[in-house]
Amino acid sequence: MPELPEVETTRRGIAPHLEGQRVSRVIVRDRRLRWPIPEDLDVRLSGQRIVLVERRAKYLLINAEVGTLISHLGMSGNLRLVEVGMPAAKHEHVDIELESGLALRYTDPRRFGAMLWSNDPLNHELLIRLGPEPLTDLFDGERLYQLSRGRSMAVKPFIMDNAVVVGVGNIYATEALFAAGIDPRREAKGISRARYLKLAIEIKRILAAAIERGGTTLRDFIGGDGQPGYFQQELFVYGRGGEHCKVCGTGLREMKLGQRASVWCPRCQS
């Protein structure tokens, strides 16, 4: 699933080609996503100029002069730029054609993504309860410490809770906990303030590094410019269960936590 760095990489790839451009038409080939694409999307968006392309958590917000297109890439979706008129392959559900001659094409083989319309996106039901962005001053270790008090759940699903902080998905939660030396199975309430301060620093560092390297390409992800991400080359533990720790050589362990595969080093993490 594309996580925050992959979505931010997509935003950075498409924004320069969308902002300031006028939409000539919208082609919807299949409306059957996680939520159906609105029947009137073409009417609402065609003829409008795109003002700004933003990201909130893992949602892309394509702001027009009036209204906003909210897009989520789901499990395996992507948005990329193609030339208007390029034949569409299977699973290429939507084209947003621009007067520049480019089109923003939405592909989603598993159809778990979304393309919705809102006149008040930040108060949309999918966004209104989201926690702070991890790369802003609204998120820090003190927030993690305070919210963890009384929480008996494991620390990994705790930091993956979008009400606590957005965008810390399975890949980056796994890597941040390793970097901070914290066992992902530990109860959230049992971790000290000092260790949460360290964890928040590592979350920020790892997410920023992943964005800089274009995200992590494990299966389907490509950025808005059609290029893969390269952060997978720097993964220490994610997807490496049973292999040796790159730091100490101990065998990495793996188990399910909150329905997600979790990998950790029993020596480096406690």
UniProtKB/Swiss-Prot annotation:
Binding site for DNA: 91, 110, 151
UniProt remark on cofactor binding: Binds 1 zinc ion per subunit.
Positions annotated as zinc finger (FPG-type): 236-270
PROSITE patterns with a match to the protein in the record: FPG_CAT, ZF_FPG_1, ZF_FPG_2
An annotated GO BP: base-excision repair
Pfam families recorded: Fapy_DNA_glyco, H2TH, zf-FPG_IleRS
Active site: residue positions: 2-3, 58, 260
Family: Belongs to the FPG family.
Protein name as it appears in the record: Formamidopyrimidine-DNA glycosylase
UniProt source species: Pseudomonas fluorescens (strain Pf0-1)
Zinc among keywords: yes
Entry cofactors: Zn(2+)
InterPro entries recorded: DNA_glyclase/AP_lyase_DNA-bd (IPR015886), DNA_glyclase_Znf_dom_DNA_BS (IPR015887), Formamido-pyr_DNA_Glyclase (IPR020629), FPG_cat (IPR012319), MutM-like_N-ter (IPR035937), Ribosomal_uS13-like_H2TH (IPR010979), Znf_DNA_glyclase/AP_lyase (IPR000214), Znf_FPG/IleRS (IPR010663)
Keywords carried by this UniProt record: DNA damage, DNA repair, DNA-binding, Glycosidase, Hydrolase, Lyase, Metal-binding, Multifunctional enzyme, Zinc, Zinc-finger
Subunit structure: Monomer.
Purpose of the protein: Involved in base excision repair of DNA damaged by oxidation or by mutagenic agents. Acts as a DNA glycosylase that recognizes and removes damaged bases. Has a preference for oxidized purines, such as 7,8-dihydro-8-oxoguanine (8-oxoG). Has AP (apurinic/apyrimidinic) lyase activity and introduces nicks in the DNA strand. Cleaves the DNA backbone by beta-delta elimination to generate a single-strand break at the site of the removed base with both 3'- and 5'-phosphates.
Catalytic activity: Hydrolysis of DNA containing ring-opened 7-methylguanine residues, releasing 2,6-diamino-4-hydroxy-5-(N-methyl)formamidopyrimidine; 2'-deoxyribonucleotide-(2'-deoxyribose 5'-phosphate)-2'-deoxyribonucleotide-DNA = a 3'-end 2'-deoxyribonucleotide-(2,3-dehydro-2,3-deoxyribose 5'-phosphate)-DNA + a 5'-end 5'-phospho-2'-deoxyribonucleoside-DNA + H(+)
A molecular-function term among this protein's GO annotations: 8-oxo-7,8-dihydroguanine DNA N-glycosylase activity
EC number: 3.2.2.23, 4.2.99.18
